[in-house]
């Protein structure tokens, strides 16, 4: 995107933070205004994460102005808020390509820029990595500083507190900035708070406060106020400062995160402080664009839109997403069973649980960004006779793997996992692709795993998992619109026979064993090859009798899945064939052994040879 020098006279001159640091402070507020407008214009034309970045404009400018990046380490947690950072670090002209195939990564990425110290995408990793970098920097003795920026949602995760507990123990020189955008924690910002912040951020106060009131009163003026601050330091601004102080941090704040000069002043004071520092800033998600300020959840991630209209485009598609199918089913069964408990780790809207949360608030739990807790919480409910359903993205279930094994599967508890975003998710790239779940779940004893091929099967499999009371079960479905199927059949729900596949097309010589929503593409290929097509439905347990029959009556078997080939559903078929000494060649088609970058779902599937044309070519090449 071309940066018009007339519209952006200051931003247009800045290609690196070094150039930013050459500006006088008088220009910083104007730069922030230009950067905010540039972000609005670029995201409206390209789509992407929006509201978070609007809220971190001033912080981004202040950090790159005060700290000597990239020599100093600057880490963004998750990365939703890092678009302004990308714009200021040499990627302004490519920002329009973000989240597109061969474009900028959706989150900070080490392969993309030396300013991206840590590749991110999942939450709450910044402080752990930052502490490692801070300790390494201390051993270098070059004066390098480390800063971690984390949001009020991400800081609720256990990993963040584990890292802060360690950082407080090591006393390393590390600055954590809490970007509190009023979506979770909130504190008032006022004149007294600002005055306290100035005192707390001064080096002399940081050095001397350990000796408490006597030294503070002797050294600093306004004795009465300082005595009060000294007495109340551990309770300053309520529980926030008390908690972080007890973890070993020097708590500073809260600070107005939209006053760039105030941030520069405070960061300069903090930069050379010794030990772990905690700066609490208050920002407004969507700041500077009124529609995003009023509804930051809606404007968190956006399609292309017209900024002047103040509204997002309305889709008129009659199609329904798999997430919505799950939400509809959840409401359908909850109407008859008050022991159903729906659980999500901070993904209510994305998982299709908004209506359920409104209709059945006593049966709904958003546990925040706490995947491990979500799973073990579900285990406790199951032990007590309730029917927990954990709605979770495939990529985030990875974070709770031990809990799935230790707390659910070993105890054989009836917990249903509704695993959303299985397979290719598209624009969010390699950190969010659901490439591994069939592999990492299939090896767990006691686990039932189902892969629906359409909306109807999705509902019936969810119901089957809900009614299965002998252990844990998984229904795994992709992002995006569902293949409709015959949804009229699901007005009266019924269970599917366990481990039974369905032959969708009878053919000769070649049998295609499909797992999941690539069935339509598989059907096109099967018709062209006159092959038998089977909707296997169950990854575990497999329909072993059907596999034996197919092996007996065909010359080759093809397995097809939107999961990594290594350890996936096809591997399960291979294992069964070898164990039973069935003499038939098998081709496994699925995701390759590398991390898959961003792009649209259709672009990626085509590139990987998982559309109809690609599947056909793979089979023909292998046979001949």
UniProtKB/Swiss-Prot annotation:
Keywords, ordered alphabetically: Isoprene biosynthesis, Magnesium, Metal-binding, Thiamine biosynthesis, Thiamine pyrophosphate, Transferase
Protein's pathway: Metabolic intermediate biosynthesis; 1-deoxy-D-xylulose 5-phosphate biosynthesis; 1-deoxy-D-xylulose 5-phosphate from D-glyceraldehyde 3-phosphate and pyruvate: step 1/1
Gene for this chain: dxs
Subunit structure: Homodimer.
Details of cofactor binding: Binds 1 Mg(2+) ion per subunit. Binds 1 thiamine pyrophosphate per subunit.
Cofactor(s) annotated in UniProt: Mg(2+); thiamine diphosphate
Gene Ontology cellular-component terms listed: cytosol
Annotated positions binding Mg(2+): 152, 181
Membership in a protein family: Belongs to the transketolase family. DXPS subfamily.
Source taxonomy: Bacteria, Pseudomonadati, Pseudomonadota, Gammaproteobacteria, Enterobacterales
Function: Catalyzes the acyloin condensation reaction between C atoms 2 and 3 of pyruvate and glyceraldehyde 3-phosphate to yield 1-deoxy-D-xylulose-5-phosphate (DXP).
UniProt keyword Cell division present: no
NCBIfam families: dxs, PRK05444.2-2
Enzyme class, spelled out: transferase
EC number of this enzyme: 2.2.1.7
Residues annotated as binding thiamine diphosphate: 80, 121-123, 153-154, 181, 289, 371
SUPFAM superfamilies in alphabetical order: Thiamin diphosphate-binding fold (THDP-binding), TK C-terminal domain-like
Protein name per its UniProtKB record: 1-deoxy-D-xylulose-5-phosphate synthase
InterPro entries, per database record: Dxylulose-5-P_synthase, THDP-binding, Transketo_C/PFOR_II, Transketolase-like_Pyr-bd, Transketolase_BS, Transketolase_C, Transketolase_CS
Catalysed transformations (reactions): D-glyceraldehyde 3-phosphate + pyruvate + H(+) = 1-deoxy-D-xylulose 5-phosphate + CO2
Gene Ontology molecular function terms on file: 1-deoxy-D-xylulose-5-phosphate synthase activity; magnesium ion binding; thiamine pyrophosphate binding
């Amino acid at each position: 995107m071309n940066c018009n020098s007339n519209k952006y006279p200051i931003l247009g001159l800045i290609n690196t933070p070094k150039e930013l640091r050459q500006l006088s402070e008088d220009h910083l507020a104007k730069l922030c205004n230009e950067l905010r407008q540039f972000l609005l214009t670029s995201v409206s034309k390209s789509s992407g994460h929006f509201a978070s970045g609007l809220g971190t404009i001033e912080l981004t400018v202040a950090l790159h102005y005060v700290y000597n990046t990239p020599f100093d380490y600057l880490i963004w947690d998750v990365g939703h808020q890092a678009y302004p950072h990308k714009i200021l670090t040499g990627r302004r002209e490519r920002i329009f390509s973000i989240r597109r195939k061969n474009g900028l990564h959706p989150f900070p990425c080490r392969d993309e820029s030396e300013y991206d110290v840590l590749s991110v995408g999942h939450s709450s990793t910044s402080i752990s990595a930052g502490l490692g970098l801070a300790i390494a920097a201390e051993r270098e003795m070059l004066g390098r500083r480390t800063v971690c920026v984390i949001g009020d949602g991400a800081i609720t995760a256990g990993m963040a507190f584990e890292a802060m507990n360690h950082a407080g123990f090591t006393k390393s020189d590390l600055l954590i900035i809490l970007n509190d955008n009023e979506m979770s924690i909130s504190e008032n910002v006022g004149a007294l708070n600002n005055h306290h912040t100035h005192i707390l951020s001064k080096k002399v106060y940081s050095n001397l406060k350990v000796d408490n009131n006597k030294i503070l009163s002797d050294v600093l003026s306004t004795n009465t106020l300082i005595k009060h601050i000294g007495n109340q330091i551990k309770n300053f601004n309520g529980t926030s400062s008390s908690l972080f102080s007890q973890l070993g941090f020097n708590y500073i704040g809260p600070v107005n995160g939209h006053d760039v000069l105030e941030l520069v002043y405070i960061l300069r004071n903090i930069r050379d402080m010794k030990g772990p520092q905690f700066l609490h800033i208050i920002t407004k998600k969507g700041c500077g664009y009124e529609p995003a300020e009023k509804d930051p959840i809606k404007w968190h991630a956006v399609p292309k839109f017209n900024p002047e209209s103040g509204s997002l485009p309305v889709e008129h598609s009659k199609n329904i997403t798999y997430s919505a199918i799950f939400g509809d089913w959840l409401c359908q069964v909850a109407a008859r069973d008050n022991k159903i408990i729906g659980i999500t780790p901070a993904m209510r809207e994305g998982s299709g649980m908004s209506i359920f949360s409104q209709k059945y608030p006593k049966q709904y739990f958003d546990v925040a960004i706490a995947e491990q807790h979500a799973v073990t919480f579900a285990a406790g409910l199951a032990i007590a006779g309730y029917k927990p359903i954990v709605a979770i993205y495939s990529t985030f279930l990875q974070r709770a793997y031990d809990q799935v094994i230790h707390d659910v599967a070993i105890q054989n508890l009836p917990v249903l996992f509704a695993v959303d975003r299985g397979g290719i998710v598209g624009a969010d790239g390699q950190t969010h692709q659901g490439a591994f779940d069939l592999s990492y779940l299939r090896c767990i004893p006691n686990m039932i795993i189902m892969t629906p091929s359409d909306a109807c099967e999705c509902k019936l499999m969810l119901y089957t998992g809900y009614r299965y009371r002998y252990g844990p079960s998984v229904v795994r479905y992709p992002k995006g619109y569902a293949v409709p199927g015959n949804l009229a059949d699901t007005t009266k729900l019924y269970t599917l026979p366990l481990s039974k596949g369905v032959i969708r097309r009878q053919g000769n010589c070649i049998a295609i064993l499909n797992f999941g929503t690539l069935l339509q593409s598989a059907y096109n290929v099967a018709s062209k090859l006159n092959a038998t097509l089977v909707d296997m439905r169950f990854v575990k347990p497999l329909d072993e009798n059907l596999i034996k029959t197919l092996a007996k009556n065909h010359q080759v078997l093809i397995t097809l899945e939107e999961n990594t080939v290594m350890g996936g559903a096809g591997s399960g078929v291979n294992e069964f064939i070898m164990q039973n000494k069935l003499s038939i060649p098998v081709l496994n088609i699925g995701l390759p052994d590398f991390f898959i970058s961003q792009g649209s779902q259709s672009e990626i599937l085509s590139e990987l040879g998982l559309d109809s044309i690609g599947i056909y070519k793979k089979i023909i090449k292998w046979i001949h």
